[in-house]
Regions:
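Acidic catalytic/metal-coordinating carboxylates
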Residues: 46-50, 73-79
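Acidic, metal-coordinating helix/loop segments flanking the phosphotransfer/catalytic sites
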Residues: 44-62
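Alpha4 helix (beta4-alpha4-beta5 surface) of REC/receiver domains from two-component response regulators
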Residues: 31, 76, 89, 100-115
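Non-catalytic signal-transmission and effector/linker regions of two-component phosphorelay proteins
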Residues: 1-18, 141-169
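Receiver (REC) domain active-site loop signature in two-component systems and cognate sites
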Residues: 69
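Two-component/phosphorelay signaling modules centered on CheY-like receiver
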Residues: 24-43
Length: 169
């Protein structure tokens, strides 16, 4: 398998990560995790009402989202994010919450979360999940770019085909 097709450490280290959590201690812990994992572009917002504005301005590659926050709660923020992301784009959302039940996991996944971890999180596990979600995002973007190039090449080939009396041969 050609490793050039997969996102490298440099691409992963420059990924933009946005954390949305109303608990300052959790924000500091996530910032520490990102620093230790060599993710250089970390931004946080502790006011869920500002989350969408920060999201639009920062344009992250990954969102770390707490579910239990003052209005709007994490489910409302997740819904807003999903409505904002253009069709065909893949924005991974990793839900982190202290209310870790099977029902909460199902509800979060149905609402559009890509992954779910209960708090407190394990440093290694959250790092691995973040890396996996970022790799998926970058591979999705790369696939879209390749499809666009293939479509353009196919259109150019079709335009260059010889014709006879206006009909393609």
């Amino acid at each position: 398998m050609n490793n050039d097709l997969f996102p490298g450490e440099e691409q992963l280290s420059t990924a933009k990560i946005l954390a949305v959590d109303d608990e300052d201690g959790d924000i500091r812990a996530l910032e520490w995790v990102c620093r230790m994992a060599k993710f250089a572009n970390f931004r946080s917002v502790n006011d869920s009402a500002r989350a969408l504005d920060v999201f639009r301005e920062f344009q992250p590659d990954l969102v770390l989202l707490d579910l239990h926050m003052p209005e709007p709660d994490g489910f409302a923020v997740l819904k807003q994010l999903r409505e904002t992301v253009p069709a065909g784009d893949f924005l991974p959302v990793l839900v982190l919450t202290g209310h870790d039940t099977i029902e909460m996991r199902k509800r979060a996944m149905k609402a559009g979360a890509n992954d779910f971890l209960g708090k407190p999180v394990d440093y290694t596990e959250v790092t691995l999940r973040m890396r996996n979600l970022l790799q998926t995002r970058f591979l999705h973007r790369q696939t879209q770019e390749m499809q666009a190039r293939l479509k353009a090449l196919t259109a150019a080939q079709e335009a260059d085909k010889p014709t006879k009396s206006g009909q393609k041969l």
